[in-house]
Amino acid sequence: AAGGIGQALALLLKNRLPAGSDLALYDIAPVTPGVAADLSHIPTPVTIKGYAGEDPTPALEGADVVLVSAGVARKPGMDRADLFNVNAGIVKALAETIAVVCPKACVGIITNPVNTTVPIAAEVLKKAGVYDKRKLFGVTTLDVIRSETFVAALKDKDPGQVRVPVIGGHSGVTILPLLSQVEGVTFTDEEVAALTKRIQNAGTEVVEAKAGGGSATFSMGQ
């Protein structure tokens, strides 16, 4: 929760969760309680606490929804698969704790590479006997909002009125925007090819623009 995505997401949730909700932030970084203290000053009816250290148990107790954004971010020249060796272990450890502390929670995996971290979490939950396919999912909405933004810009439309289904997970060439299903617009073959390529490489565009300073965080938090 102390990382770029975690902080952006925490801000969004502090402002948008229903009144009376409890929001728990967890990170191994000691700054996490400070992030929560900062966000607690926003005048919304959402209670927020931050937890730091090696054990996520206090943050997970009683959780109905768990969003996992922990892990290392991409740097220029890396693709999402390069993150596997580090991030797979992080997701595995968190899933093991979730299986014990809040086995009935809905679990959303943001940590890349999503196409492989989600199956890892699934196997951990299966081994613990608490797997429910309805309650474990990969968060790939970023590809949808990117698609809607790019299509709207190309076709001079209101981004809020454009809907683009995206399938295939969140791993480079597997990202497939279904442009033929966008209502009210048509595309040439050249536009389809160019849009698809840009959507698939949008994450790399951000990583390179940040020049080693991180990956997509604000748009991911949204």
UniProtKB/Swiss-Prot annotation:
UniProt GO cellular component terms: cytoplasm
Keyword terms, alphabetized: NAD, Oxidoreductase, Tricarboxylic acid cycle
Superkingdom assignment: Bacteria
Matches recorded under Gene3D superfamilies: Lactate dehydrogenase/glycoside hydrolase, family 4, C-terminal (3.90.110.10), NAD(P)-binding Rossmann-like Domain (3.40.50.720)
Cysteines engaged in disulfide bonds, as pairs: none
Binding-site residues for substrate, renumbered to this chain: 74, 80, 112, 146
Protein known as: Malate dehydrogenase
Protein species of origin: Vibrio mimicus
